[in-house]
């Protein structure tokens, strides 16, 4: 395959590089905890993402325990807009909250189909993400987001109850974070979800 040919060429090119490890794997199937020892205390990600796996790849990166300090991503423009979306917009969702919680995001440039060969049918974009200093990991955040956005048109209260919380516990959680009982997940800023995740620790 073309991917195997590229791998073989790069393997030969970097055969004598002592600080370089080349892996030929499906990223979505790769155990990132096994890769972590190769990366040191900090790492960066540079990727031209296949459009059809953009969301699962980005969610895996954003929820991993890897010490990712910076990312530079080329991806479909529509997917890029989800990183910078505002609460209440159609693009706003779990990926948005995770990215904005942990990273400062810059929309660098837009790329038209004419910049590629063969030409895709969609526009592309380049984003950079820089880890926000002092922001701690919240292991419960992905679970909170999965519950909160499970049914977008339902209230956060209903979604939390569907996830197994009693009405009393759900009400107490929302009150602690200053969230109205009738609020929907798509209308809340990332800080609200961070509060919920911290309260659930």
Model regions: which residues?
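Accessory (non-catalytic) regions of SAM-dependent nucleic-acid methyltransferases
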Residues: 197-200
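An accessory alpha-helical subdomain
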Residues: 125-129, 137-171, 177-180, 187, ...
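Residue-level marker of motif borders
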Residues: 71, 182-184
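Catalytic cores of RNA-modifying enzymes
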Residues: 1-147, 175
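Short secondary-structure boundary/hinge segments and terminal tails
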Residues: 116, 191-192
């Amino acid at each position: 395959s073309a991917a195997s040919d590229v791998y073989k060429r790069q393997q030969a090119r970097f055969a004598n590089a002592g600080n370089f490890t080349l892996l030929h794997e499906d990223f979505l199937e790769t155990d990132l905890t096994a890769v972590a020892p190769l990366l040191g205390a900090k790492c960066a990600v540079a990727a031209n993402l296949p459009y059809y796996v953009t969301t699962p790849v980005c969610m895996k990166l954003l929820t991993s325990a890897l010490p990712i300090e910076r990312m530079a991503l080329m991806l479909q423009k529509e997917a890029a807009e989800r990183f910078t979306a505002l609460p209440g917009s159609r693009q706003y969702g779990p990926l948005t909250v995770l990215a904005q919680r942990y990273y400062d995001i810059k929309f660098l440039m837009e790329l038209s189909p004419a910049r590629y060969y063969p030409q895709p049918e969609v526009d592309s974009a380049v984003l950079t993400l820089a880890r926000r200093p002092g922001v701690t990991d919240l292991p419960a955040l992905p679970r909170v987001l999965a519950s909160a956005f499970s049914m977008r048109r339902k209230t956060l209260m209903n979604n939390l109850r569907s996830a197994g919380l009693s009405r009393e516990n759900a009400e107490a959680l929302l009150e602690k974070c200053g969230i109205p009982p009738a609020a929907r997940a798509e209308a809340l800023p990332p800080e609200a979800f961070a509060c919920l995740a911290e309260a659930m620790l």
